[in-house]
């Protein structure tokens, strides 16, 4: 199994955090990583390991993005004006799979990616099957009519585990939402602390 397809719960155990705030996460029951060496006594982490962990958490949260793609987001964040760490968060939250997840059309980022890849989502009325597609402010994201009664969508909409953030607007009856604005870090409802500034430090070494 590739690292990108690694079980979401295995990612939680490896990182030692409940990345998506799911009630079923094994991290809620155990405080050590997966495998036979998971219970070893932890040493004081180095600056490098802290920065690496911050990067792995952010990559993992968005569906275990590949290193190549994640680095592209970082490089683009550097090129843009303003704070690099905020730019990075803004780019990640503009991914279509992230927006579909925020709109509660999918229960996890992994499910969102698969849902989009299978052609169940439109942007401004046109089918888009690329999870990494970057939406723009004002874009309208909708579940296709033929997909609105799928159990995966209905289950996600009804889950009480999370709310939709203020930078998206959603009508769950019509399965339609609008991306209102690009968020900053403080807007994003991460269940765990994300530290994009440490990601910037990691790549700036």
Curated annotation (Swiss-Prot):
PROSITE patterns: RIBOSOMAL_S4, S4
Pfam families: Ribosomal_S4, S4
Keywords tagged on the record: Ribonucleoprotein, Ribosomal protein, RNA-binding, rRNA-binding
Domain S4 RNA-binding, first and last residues per copy: 94-157
Single Gene Ontology BP annotation: ribosomal small subunit biogenesis
Keyword rRNA-binding on entry: yes
Region (Disordered): 26-46
GO cellular component, one term: small ribosomal subunit
Listed GO MF terms: rRNA binding; structural constituent of ribosome
InterPro entries tied to this protein: Ribosomal_uS4 (IPR022801), Ribosomal_uS4_bac-type (IPR005709), Ribosomal_uS4_CS (IPR018079), Ribosomal_uS4_N (IPR001912), S4_RNA-bd (IPR002942), S4_RNA-bd_sf (IPR036986)
Quaternary structure and partners: Part of the 30S ribosomal subunit. Contacts protein S5. The interaction surface between S4 and S5 is involved in control of translational fidelity.
Family statement: Belongs to the universal ribosomal protein uS4 family.
Function in brief: One of the primary rRNA binding proteins, it binds directly to 16S rRNA where it nucleates assembly of the body of the 30S subunit.
Protein name per UniProt: Small ribosomal subunit protein uS4
Provenance organism: Gluconobacter oxydans (strain 621H)
